[in-house]
Amino acid sequence: MVALLGAGAISLVFTLFLTPLFIKLFHRLQWGQFIRDDGPQSHHTKRGTATMGGIVIILASVIGYFAGHLLTWDGIRFDPVTPSGLLVVFMMVGLGFVGFLDDYLKTRKQQSLGLGGWQKIAGQVIVATVFAVLAITLRDPVSGLTPASTAISLFRDLPLDFMALGAVIGTGLFIVWICLIVASASNGVNVADGLDGLAAGASIFSIGSYVIIGFWQFNQSCDSVSSYQNEYRCYEVASPLDLAIIAASIVGALIGFLWWNTSPAQIFMGDTGSLGLGGALAALAILSRTELLLVFIGGLFVIVAGSVVLQRAYFKITKGKRIFLMSPLHHHFELKGWAEVTVVVRFWIIAGLLVAAGVGTFYLEWITQ
């Protein structure tokens, strides 16, 4: 508990008080946001706002995570970091680096296109593939479990194990499955990062849910004396408490960052932040074995990304007609006359309700066993 609270508090203090220094640094480096001409006209005033704030979020999250563990020092030892926690860090940093390359090219060229679409996907696939291999290779030093399972999961593992098809085919399909989850989550957060504070606030709800889920799984783990030793009620998850700790560190970093990112934003997270956060969200879902629950927990990102897919598909099928005034969905409501802050707060409410539904069904599954 000390590590969990400490990680969140340290990362929050880091972003809350040090973000202004990074804003000045980014302006000096000329890392300013480029605004597309075909976007909402009201966004043109944001041109030049410091971007790549994801660097601050990721740095604070990593520092908070390790510092939280150091706080458990009792004069002899401290609670060590685990493969599960380090894998979340790896995913966040890895996809954050892909986003950084995209952001850097945008600021250098002063155009909306940094990395090409397929280049960005390739980066996500490389990071996700390494993550997938490590997640079924490494072992938790206490429980002996691998951080991830090769089975598809909802509230826990379902009887749908890729390895039932054989080691080679099963491993290949598992890697494809992980790449699909990672690409969907990271691009979902990326698409939602279009209004001041929208992605940061929604991510607080989504990633914050894994503080609750991880802590609950820790208390009800199959090797815990507090569990009923019932295979249908306990959770076989490697290091769930450490997943809660890294989730708390990310949430703390986001809360402090949101202070400066709320409208009118003084800094944007950029693709560095949105891809990194989406990667962390995917990693938390995979390692806590709640992958399909992401439909609820990341529900807002599903809706926003879905609006883009729907708009493009309808445009092609009807040869030029549109469902929305503009996609992603938040821009549609802006063009309908909603104030930016109104759109953001209402989307936060939707995100919160969907997360509550996800966590609620997670708990409901346990009490009905």
Curated annotation (Swiss-Prot):
It comes from the Bacteria. It comes from Clavibacter sepedonicus (Clavibacter michiganensis subsp. sepedonicus). It is found in: Cell membrane. Keywords: Cell cycle, Cell division, Cell membrane, Cell shape, Cell wall biogenesis/degradation, Magnesium, Membrane, Metal-binding, Peptidoglycan synthesis, Transferase, Transmembrane, Transmembrane helix. It holds the Pfam family Glycos_transf_4. This is Phospho-N-acetylmuramoyl-pentapeptide-transferase. One of its GO terms (cellular component) is plasma membrane. It is an enzyme of class 2 (transferase). Its main location: membrane.
